[in-house]
Amino acid sequence: LPSVTEYYRAHTPVREVGPGDIDWDHLFGELRTRWFSTGGIYTSLSDKTANLAVEGMKKAGQYGAGRSFDLNYRSNVEPDKNRARDINREIVPHVEFLVGNQDDFDDALGYETEKVPKDASFEVWLDIYTKMLRQVANDYPNLKYIGTQLRGALSADRINWSAVLYDVESDVV
């Protein structure tokens, strides 16, 4: 049986929460929240959620809180890749730790990379991904770390899966 994932978010209440609705000064100032994280599914729910995420990232940065973002592109939530890219290109300049897989970096930010054969060695994956990670870091100098998953489904039962973390400052993957 084929796998089907349903992302029904059209009437979820959180899509109505927008800029000005959250007391960021209370969260990051008084409560001393140390980390703010969100992702592509949330920011694609509505213009309000996208703008709220940008507002939160900026405010977290003002208070010195860590900021992470999972690109997490889902065409079932936002079928328009250009809209998703526009949103993400506004958010990523305020992020320190960015996460996504190869397809996310393409679909959600517009980085086209060489496709890796599913049965490729880890070294081949790493070489191709390292080029992409360095390009993303060059385009977004605010980033400190970029995480990505290396995944090749050989069959329903066999998947090559690993992950890497790119430390931008030391240029180590």
For every predicted segment, state its role.
Residues 1-43, 69:
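Conserved N-terminal subdomain of the carbohydrate kinase-like
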Residues 10, 41, 72-76, 103, ...:
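Active-site beta-loop-alpha junctions enriched in small/polar residues
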Residues 12-16, 45-46, 74-79, 122-125:
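Short, flexible loop segments at the rims of nucleotide/cofactor-binding pockets, characterized by
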Residues 15-16, 44-45, 107, 154-155:
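Short glycine-rich, flexible loops that bind phosphorylated cofactors or substrates
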Residues 16-24, 51-55, 81-87, 127-131:
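Active-site glycine-rich loop that binds ribose-phosphate moieties when present
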Residues 42-51, 109-110, 116:
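Glycine/threonine-rich flexible loop motifs
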Residues 54-61, 67, 137:
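Surface-exposed amphipathic alpha-helices with a cationic face
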Residues 63, 77-170:
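Conserved phosphate/ATP/ADP-binding segment of small-molecule kinases
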